[in-house]
Amino acid sequence: MESGVNLGRRLRLSTISLLALWAGTASAQNRVITADRMIDVQTGKSVEYPAIFVGEDGRISNIADARTVRWGSDVKHINLSGKTLLPGLVDMHVHLDSPANIGGYRGLEFTDSFWGMTAVANGQAMLDAGFTTVRNVGSGNRNDIGLKQAIDAGYVQGPRIVPAGYALGATGGHCDSTFLPPSLDKGEK
């Protein structure tokens, strides 16, 4: 997996995909988001000068032409001139608490709580890269569930998480994090 930070920097050069984040905050208020372009995923076309209205419930209530539509002074305006909006991206296979650069026996050097901290950093990196929803498909110590709770409670920023908790796998197989043979438990040599 490419570093989320590097991926985020590349994506932010040409697009802004925080629309879903703003639309989904708990303290949603009436607001309008304007930009130079918006990708319409249903038609596959670029829409020029969109004005996206977000209601009290955090949902998009209307999309209009920013050059002709007007809104009241009670509506918060988020001006993203020069940017292109796209819907939040979804990644259906992530391991937020498993940094790609730490594998094998090297993982045994770290405490259990370390992996939860990496999940926080990787969740933020995924969000910065434009991913607003992820499915975490296995996490030691249920770090994905803890991160989801912290995000939902507003303690940290990150994408919506569909957690799995512990991964399922065969002893000695893909999900066996000890990397040790089952015979070791029996004292065999």
Can you describe what each PLM-predicted range is?
Residues E2-S17:
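Bacterial N-terminal signal peptides that target proteins for export
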Residues S46, R70-G72, L127-D128, G154-Q157:
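Extracellular/periplasmic catalytic domains that process cell-envelope and extracellular macromolecules
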Residues K83-Y155, T171-D176:
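Metal-associated gating/positioning segment near the N- to mid-region
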Residues Y155-K189:
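Metal-coordinating catalytic core of metallo-dependent amide/deamination hydrolases
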